[in-house]
Structures are given as structure tokens and as C-alpha cells.
């Protein structure tokens, strides 16, 4: 069996004295889309922040391409090829759309994602490239956040609640772009409360409940009843 791109093993994580994750394990294969679902406070964002190096953990709790990175700082994780699209987008208000995108490419990692390719993926950003990024609609700001992460030419893209606060039609538009991203050879981990979108986009699903994996399996094999039981802990 080929080695996974990402291998999370018995990960414990938290904030100070508060423990948010308890022995979480998951794998992501090259080119795979994995969804992590769960209610508010289930530990989904903590999992992504741990993988991204925003929260340091045990060295061998997270392996990327076979290399232990659990204790790596965020900048070292990005350099290895992992990029995070954070919850809330976190764009630089004083910078234009194009300036925000260019920040993602500062490491100079080689790959297919250039400004031209981002504008091809999200044409509306080309039209608004000289505007302040925070003057855009919420959906367009999310496109900037995704584009900025892609500009680092990652092998693994982590997306934290990309549908949060967006109209359903905008969410569908953004999710419709994900296959084009995967086609460039990326793997994706999507944290999502919208279960329908998560199941449609992913091949594997992990459901967290109070910091633990309550359910894991192929997206097309999980029943609504099983997901509801794991999601709500009933």
C-alpha cells in the first residue's frame, strides 16, 4: 500500500490547559479529498491548525511525506508544501487583491499556481485585482484566500469552513472549482459544517465529536443515520 501524503497518529492537541483533541488519527492519500465534519467545538479547526503548525504537537504525531512535522513551526510546514485557508479568510485590508495573492507566493516554491492561473480559476479576481481585498463580497474574499494559499504551490491544501457566512449559490460556485485544484495534483482536507457539501466533495469523511473521531469512512458508504449519530453524539 502506498505511503499516505499525510499521516496523523494519535494526535492530542489543545490551547494551554484546555485539551481539544484526544488521540485523533487520519490519513490523506495523494490526490485525495478528505472532509472533516462535526458540530461547533468538535475540534475541527484545532486539527487543521495542528497540521498547519499553528499549534505545536508531538513530533511524530503528524507525518507529511513520511517526515515527522508535528513540532514544526508554521513557516516550516508551509515550506514543506502545506497551505491553510483559515476560517474567516484573514485578508490584509490595506492591500489589493493582487497584493494579497502575491503574499502567498513569497516562498517561491515551483509549481503550476501563478497569478495567471489563479485568475483563470477565479476570473472575477482578475477584474478586481487593483481593488482593496476587503472591499470585495464575502465569496470573492474567500476566493482571494484560496488563491493566496494556492500561490505557495502546496501539495496539501487545508480549507477551514470555506462556506461560513456565504450564500448557498456562492458556496456551490467555490466548491465547483475544487476539482480543478485537485487536477493539478493537490490533496485537500476540508473542514465543513455543511454536511451535504462535504459528502459531495470528498472521498473520505471523518466526523469529530468532542475532540475524538466518532466516525470515519468512504463518503459514499456512510448513511445519514450513522452521520447524525456521530455528529450529535447520540
Question: What kind of region is each of these model predictions?
Answer:
Residues 60-68, 80, 113-114, 120, ...:
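Conserved ABC transporter NBD signature motif
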Residues 132-136, 140:
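Conserved ABC ATPase signature
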Amino acid at each position: 500500500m502506498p505511503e499516505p501524503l499525510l499521516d496523523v497518529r494519535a494526535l492530542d492537541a489543545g490551547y494551554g490547559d484546555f485539551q481539544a483533541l484526544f488521540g485523533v488519527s487520519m490519513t490523506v492519500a495523494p490526490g485525495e479529498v478528505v472532509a472533516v465534519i462535526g458540530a461547533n467545538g468538535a475540534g475541527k479547526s484545532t486539527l487543521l491548525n495542528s497540521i498547519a503548525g499553528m499549534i505545536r504537537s508531538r513530533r511524530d504525531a503528524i507525518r507529511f511525506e513520511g517526515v515527522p512535522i508535528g513540532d514544526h513551526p508554521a513557516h516550516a510546514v508551509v515550506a514543506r508544501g502545506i497551505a491553510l485557508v483559515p476560517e474567516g479568510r484573514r485578508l490584509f485590508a490595506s492591500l489589493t487583491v493582487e497584493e494579497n495573492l502575491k503574499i502567498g507566493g513569497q516562498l517561491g516554491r515551483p509549481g503550476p499556481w501563478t497569478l495567471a492561473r489563479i485568475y483563470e480559476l477565479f476570473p472575477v479576481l482578475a477584474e478586481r485585482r487593483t481593488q482593496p481585498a476587503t472591499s470585495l463580497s464575502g465569496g470573492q474574499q474567500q476566493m482571494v484566500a484560496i488563491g493566496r494559499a494556492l500561490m505557495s504551490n502546496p501539495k496539501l491544501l487545508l480549507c477551514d469552513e470555506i462556506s461560513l457566512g456565504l450564500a448557498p449559490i456562492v458556496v456551490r460556485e467555490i466548491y465547483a472549482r475544487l476539482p480543478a485544484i485537485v487536477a493539478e495534483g493537490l490533496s485537500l482536507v476540508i473542514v465543513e459544517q455543511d454536511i451535504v457539501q462535504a459528502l459531495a466533495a470528498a472521498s473520505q469523511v471523518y466526523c469529530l465529536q468532542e475532540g475524538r473521531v466518532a466516525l470515519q469512512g468512504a463518503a459514499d458508504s456512510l448513511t445519514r443515520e450513522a452521520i447524525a449519530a456521530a455528529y450529535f453524539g447520540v
